[in-house]
Amino acid sequence: MKKTEFLEIDGASGGYYALIALLGALIAIGLGAAYYMEHSGHHVTGMTNQIVWGTPHVFAVFLIVAASGALNVASIGSVFGKTPYKPLSRLSAVLAIALLAGGLAILVLDLGRPDRLIVAMTYYNFKSIFAWNIFLYTGFLVIVAVYLWMMMERRMNRYSRPVGLVAFIWRLILTTGTGSIFGFLVARQAYDAALMAPMFIAMSFSFGLAAFLLVLMASYRGTARPLGDELLIRLKNLLGVFVATVLYFVMVYHLTNLYGTEHHGVQGFILLDGGIYTQLFWIVQILLGSLLPLFLLYHPRLGRSRASIATSAALVILGGLAQIYVLIIGGQAYPLVMFPGKEVSSSFFDGVVASYSPSLPEVLLGLGGVAMALIIVALGIKILRLLPLSLGDASPSTDSGAESSGEPSAAGA
């Protein structure tokens, strides 16, 4: 069969320069917000001694989880041998690197003392999942970069499958580690669950594929390159499966917690009387982020509409952000149960639901991390041969390991 031709985009249009300028401005604003919080102190944020992980952590965890899932498209093509996905492998790998870089940038800038990161990188407490995650995150970046090299270098193509298998296993471990950050926190009743690790893996598949779909559709629309309905339908059906899987894990998580009397308090808080957290859970996470996308993706007519597919992917991302917000911030807002069966009160807000309102600098820092991920992808498709010249239904291209011919780029972007 004819090999796939990969070409850089021209990147000479006004729209492309406007996109780069917008993303660059968001990054600059995010850096400014980080500087403001660093020099003014975290009292200018909505975070307190009760809620120490705020909105930046929501963005960071979302990007890190989505990074693992974004690589899933490459894994399906090279590791599991599904030919239609192979031309997408390069973009999948770059998006995974970009999302993880954006998430880690938010984390580092939100630490308060990012210069102290050197301590965490030189002195390890291997009883802490945070110490393990340093290796998992940096290892992921290195392995995926090598994986991308194997795919793009013709003489190294034969190694792409074994390296892809290593990347596949590594990303499962990485997402397990991210979920275990919360699963191992036994003091927080909203976190303490072994189900966190597999649920985060399912979340990564859903969030990552949703992000990949939006990037893919935007890239081919902006460059006027053919993108066939057949491939989009494959991807949207896969997204529907992942969304349903996440919904299943969420249901099992809450049902198992409701079975144990000790968790009735925190479950009642999240599901019934948690105010904004309850609203985010039912309206944004469940209705808008799960049920509505499933309806749009599997509707006989709407499911074939590109607008519906893009809307569904955007809703999945919105629901994912709400899910992580409820998990991270709602889990901290519910008071610690220090003495089970007893009522606790003190001047240190023991036994009181903590209040939290996202501040503008926190949101801007999070958006800066998202912009950083997107600008890496935008520059990547201009500098490297990541995008196939055609993904049309009639295209016989199926081999992602092929070198492009080096002809001038197609018009667009």
Across the structure, where does each feature detected by a protein language model lie?
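C-terminal hydrophobic structural anchor segments
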Residues: V284-L287, L292-L364
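Membrane-interface interhelical loops and short amphipathic "cap" helices
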Residues: A34-H57, L109-F130, G179-F200, L227, ...
